[in-house]
Swiss-Prot record:
The chain crosses the membrane at residues 14-34, 63-83, 92-112, 128-148, 154-174. It is found in: Cell inner membrane. Catalyzes the transfer of an acyl group from acyl-phosphate (acyl-PO(4)) to glycerol-3-phosphate (G3P) to form lysophosphatidic acid (LPA). This enzyme utilizes acyl-phosphate as fatty acyl donor, but not acyl-CoA or acyl-ACP. This is Glycerol-3-phosphate acyltransferase. The gene is plsY. Pfam families: G3P_acyltransf (PF02660). Keywords: Cell inner membrane, Cell membrane, Lipid biosynthesis, Lipid metabolism, Membrane, Phospholipid biosynthesis, Phospholipid metabolism, Transferase, Transmembrane, Transmembrane helix.
Length: 215
């Protein structure tokens, strides 16, 4: 069997450690941390109750919302960057699991009793680490839908739908797609839809709040 196919105990341990570390990084609740540092209400106590940038924006504090967005995106990127920095020979399968772990950490954070955000910014950070141009295409999709609809949730859903599509069809032209990574992106997209199920119901009813509107 080729050496690259052998999973040694040290490699399994390092991969497992990176996955756990990624989950813990994803668990950092930037919406709560930023709000507390800036003297704002806990984002879980108003609006949608979601500890994310869109809900923080409902306070009217754009700086706090921007810092939350950057923090949530940065942790998605950082977890994958750190994994490669610590273990350069990390397999693509383990890399994909690290991507899922940091995303799940945001959705179900240890530090907030497993009640986290919806994961849009963290997902974008993950995409930025995987392929910067993939992230740019996904962000552009979000911006176009958000500008014309003023619905953050609708923009997130459309962007989530197209992210794995972009990854597959961009392969060969802009990057080399990996099956394991593609599956991770697809799972992240599916989880984004699941986390937005209440938003989907409100969009269908016409009761969803628009960007910047206080509830």
């Amino acid at each position: 069997m080729p050496a690259t196919m052998v999973l040694t105990a040290p490699s399994l341990l390092s991969s497992s450690a990176l996955i756990v570390l990624a989950y813990l990084i994803g668990s950092i609740p930037f919406a709560v941390v930023v709000s507390k540092l800036m003297g704002l209400q806990d984002p879980r106590s108003y609006g949608s109750g979601n500890p994310g940038a869109t809900n923080v924006l409902r306070t009217g504090n754009k700086t706090a919302a921007a810092l939350t967005l950057l923090g949530d995106a940065a942790k998605g990127w950082f977890a994958l960057w750190l994994a490669r920095a610590l273990v350069p020979e990390l397999s693509w399968g383990a890399y994909a699991l690290v991507a899922l772990a940091v995303f799940l950490g945001h959705l179900y954070p240890l530090f907030l009793r497993f009640k986290g955000g919806k994961g849009v910014a963290t997902a974008l950070g993950v995409l930025m680490a995987i392929e910067p141009w993939l992230a740019v295409a996904t962000i552009a999709t979000w911006l176009i839908v958000a500008v014309f609809s003023r619905y953050s949730s609708l923009a997130a859903l459309v962007a989530a739908f197209f992210a794995p599509v972009y990854y597959v069809f961009g392969s060969g032209a802009a990057w080399h797609a990996r099956l394991e990574v593609g599956l991770a992106i697809a799972v992240i997209s599916a989880l984004l839809f699941y986390r937005h199920r209440a938003n989907i119901a409100r969009l269908l009813k016409g009761t969803e709040s628009r960007i910047g509107k206080k509830k």
